[in-house]
Amino acid sequence: MSQWTPEFNELYTLKVAMKSGTPDAPTTQESLKAVLLHPQPLGATKSFPAEVEMINSKVGNEFSHLCDDSQKQEKDMTGNQQEQEKSGVVRKKRKSQQAGPSYVQNCVKENQEILGRRQQLETPSDEDNDSSLSECLSSPSSSLHFGGSDTVTSDEDKEVSVRHTQPVLSAKSRSHSARSHKWPRTEADPVPSLLMKRPCFHGSALRRVTCRKRLVKSSSSQRTQKQKERMLVQRKKREALAQRKYALLSSSSSSSENDLSSDSSSSSSTDGEEDLCASASENPSNPAAPSGSIDEDVVVIEASFTPQVTANEEINVTSTDSEVEIVTVGESYRSRSTLGHSRSHWSQGSSSHTGRPQESRNRSRISTVIQPLRQNAAEVVDLTVDEDEPTIVPTTSARMDSQTTSASINNSNPSTSEQASDTTSTVASSQPSTVSETEATLTSNSATGSSVGDDVRRTASSAVPESGPPAMPRLPSCCPQHSPCGGTSQSHHALAHPHSSCFQQHGHHFQHHHHHHHTPHPAVPVSPSFSDPACPVERPQVQAPCGANSSSGSSYHDQQALPVDLSNSALRTHGSGGFHGASAFDPCCPVTSSRAAVFGHQAAAAPTQPLSIDGYGSSMVAQPQPQPPPQPSLSSCRHYMPPPYASLTRPLHHQASACHHSHGNAPPQTQPPPQVDYVIPHPVHAFHSQISSHAASHPVAPPPPTHLGSTAAPIPQHLPPAHQPISHHIPAPAPSAQRLHPHEVMQRMEVQRRRMMQHPTRAHERPPPHPHRMHPNYGHGHHIHVPQTMSSHPRQAPERTAWELGIEAGVTAATYTPGALHPHLAHYHAPPRLHHLQLGALPLMVPDMAGYPHIRYISSGLDGASFRGPFRGNFEELIHLEERLGNVNRGASQGTIERCTYPHKYKKVTTDWFSQRKLHCKQDGEEGTEEDTEEKCTICLSILEEGEDVRRLPCMHLFHQVCVDQWLITNKKCPICRVDIEAQLPSES
């Protein structure tokens, strides 16, 4: 920080100019490139308030060392040097980019290019470049992209300069591209030079430039009148820009978002480095941002991890849909309050991003706070949604935590402080309740830094270790999985990390999609529930697993991938990146914020939830997020429920799209999705055991809380491929599981709900439904034991072995697998339920069938094979089968009866040998004697009369011909002794 120079201030000014001048900026990447290559000093175009300058002065000293490298680039922006000198100190804060739908896509490419440039530039001063890169990521892009932030202009420009000095090219490029796509900028952004300064940062910095940064002084809530006025002016500018930008929302949002993501990532990467260094580290992650540059909507709170930016000095970057606010927390997160207020402003201003400038902004405000942590496309969307949907806040918090984690606990606290401030402002601005939660959480940090610090520590402890072990191969985990998503993202460029780029863009893209969708959805507000603390905790954990995401570069890539990978976002051990990636985009966001999956609620996921996950998942995650512990475990899980489970409604839709990119989102899941309703509380909604095993991404909306913490694991079970990988990169597996078509997600959710509803019934066990339905325990056993229906019957045991075991193994195991029911299974299950009802009739109609399994299994050899088939059919079929089988070897033809029996006229003869035999058999002689004279037909129980036609069977039993003939037609055995009439012919006959 000590190396910060006027040149950096120039950069900052340029960045701010980009922010405020967004309207006229080129709307094409070419224009952005041109601007990047030939940045115009923004300082000349803008004048910054004295307060901002003061803040810049404060921050400049600390960040000057980071600015050394960027100074060279800053010199290109001589017009802004003076202002940048003032705002040089601002670098301390990591600017958080706000998600801008349009910027994400454009910035991804820009970021990739910038990444290359930054790598080249970083060669001279790696540490400075990293720091500057972070600065660029945090400050320039947001400032430049958001266009017009009077209050923050000076500070932002300074901060931007600081951050962009090294990644000047990156920041400018990203900022410019994002800006041009999102909102035309009149000013030639100095982003190109900034980007050139920091190639790695390129996309992310640019995005951050896109995300307007607001540098607020110490007071968070208490802003001077001047600041308020500036804020109002900025808000107006942002709204105008946002409206323009939102026209281009779909593309710019993605880019912007990615920027945010990358910034966050790089920050967490460098964790060990100084604030600026950490920032630079984040910048490397930022390359992911370039692929999915964060929009103005995305707030990248770039927490300086070095002592230079202490918790109190850390600059809080608050962003709304349109811009990012950077608040310098000069002391004890003083800025946080300001930032919060700023954020409210920005949220309102950037509302237009979602089409509701004010409402979105407010939501964005909260989301902005979260955005920095998430820093992924979903983040951006979440930001906008967060205004209305607190979900974003947790994401930001998580992202911030990730950043913080990357930098250090202290840094985390500052980040959290920033988030808290942002959240607070958001609360004031929009989502009081949502923000309240976030604000309360963040405010505590803001006041003492301990509350957020704790959360951050939770996250940071998770995250710091994560940042400590940047080696965590989140990138590898994410990348492979991102690659599926990567394909999805149209504009992810391989410049940075192909996967990270794509995923970032994907995530951002979806985030923007979701953002647009979610902004209107209050569901997101739930996110604030799990606000920063929970989110940070959640994310960081995932990040820790993702610690492998080693340095800024890796983190950057992962972050970019994160949009695809909810888990990744969490995996992004490096603070902002990790969090934002997973939470923001994926439906699996459950990882980050239980987004979808939810699955995802949401999964998610997911991925769904993506934004949908964000919306649904966010809301879902939001609930769990308040539970820091569960959240951390779910941090990588986002939802993902699914999510396939991330969010069924909107989440489903988004999960489908988001899930595809990030984990499917989502979506899930999630899902874990997949989706969301029951997106598998166990799967994702697909949410996210640690989402690493699988996010809840399909975060199941309902299960997110447990899902995040404990359900997360279950979700991995069900959506293991999609959501479990979340830690590695839930996106890929989650996409497969959570990335189910919304229809599939719905089916899965329906199946799960059905399961839950008929839990004991086990709808999936169709074959025996009717049998066990009759059984008293029907619906109580997880396994369907058709024999259970006849469990009381002795015969049931063997049959159960053959038939029931087969059913249980085949049907129960196959059909009722963990919860990962295939869409077709879902269809199958529904019919089985019907079968339950239909077949249930059979046991009811023939109650004794349970007692006589042989009746059921007559044709199946009592093995149940045939029985299962018939029972699946209708009862009538069974009856017919029974008749056919019954008549097969049982009745005797009339000819056989005549041939084998002795028909004659009954004659009472007491001496009849037959009567004599009966007499001797009787113990009671008297009765016997009495009966000897009166024989009865045992079929009709009538006394045989003299002269009646009777038939004597080979066994010598006598019956009325009419009675016995009817019997023999159906059964050729003696009704009394069961001897076959053909078995032995009487010798006398």
From Swiss-Prot:
SMART domains: RING
Locus of motif SUMO interaction motif 2 (SIM): 323-329
InterPro entries: RNF111_N, Znf_RING, Znf_RING/FYVE/PHD, ZNRF3_Arkadia_E3_ligases
Transmembrane segments: none
Stretches for region Interaction with AXIN1: 240-402
Biological process per Gene Ontology, one example term: protein polyubiquitination
One cellular component term from this protein's GO annotations in UniProt: nucleus
Origin superkingdom: Eukaryota
Protein name as annotated: E3 ubiquitin-protein ligase Arkadia
Annotated organism of origin: Mus musculus
Encoding gene (name): Rnf111
